[in-house]
């Protein structure tokens, strides 16, 4: 509404508003804007633009950032946390489901916000693992914000919102326009919010690999779970590994260590020493100490670790 007012008043607009967006906003009648705002208020839907305080900071830097995001749940979870994307096929095997669930659960328990698309299959499995851990998770839809697709995930959506997570969409409530390409378009948002993207299981031709392409464009590291050479649903992940587009994902620590994430989703650092300057052995010692100190913090006095690092 603020941006709309600026357009009508003829004031200068932020650079991120393209000419096409300006033209659209100038053509929209004030009554339409007011009606949309009321509809969102009635459905407890929040609206974010790049000028909003809760707009995801990680999306602001994208060349194709969304001008408007509609959301339900808790917008406060969209900033100030550690975010990892978990995606994969909508028709997973038991192996893929188990890998997705175990990896997502471990990362969520470490304070990571799992990001995915609330779709059937591994998207839902990633969100469900975060809910199981009692942690926040963020979902991006390719539909109107007040429509859950598939409908089987309606309960999951309610549960993740109750835990302080959020569901976002570029499409307003009751949107009935063409859906061609909307799910592919939302893939860039999953990749954009994520600090790293994990692929649990995927075929060679799938929307999952579209998300991987966006992650590569945005400079996000990609991880893939190795699969059986006899499984069609692992052909995509194995190809990512074979061509060097992804790193092997065998344990959650493969991602957590790369992102320097300690228990609680905090940055893994040692006073006076940058992590990038430590040897692998030093990182292992520091990670182990961080984990043990976090688990014992509530059971008694703690001590701070100081050493003259020879590495």
List each model region and its residues.
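Short, small/acidic-rich helices and loops at N termini and domain boundaries
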Residues: 1-53, 301
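Glycine-biased, small-residue-rich flexible motifs in mid-sequence functional cores and linkers
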Residues: 41-43, 47-311
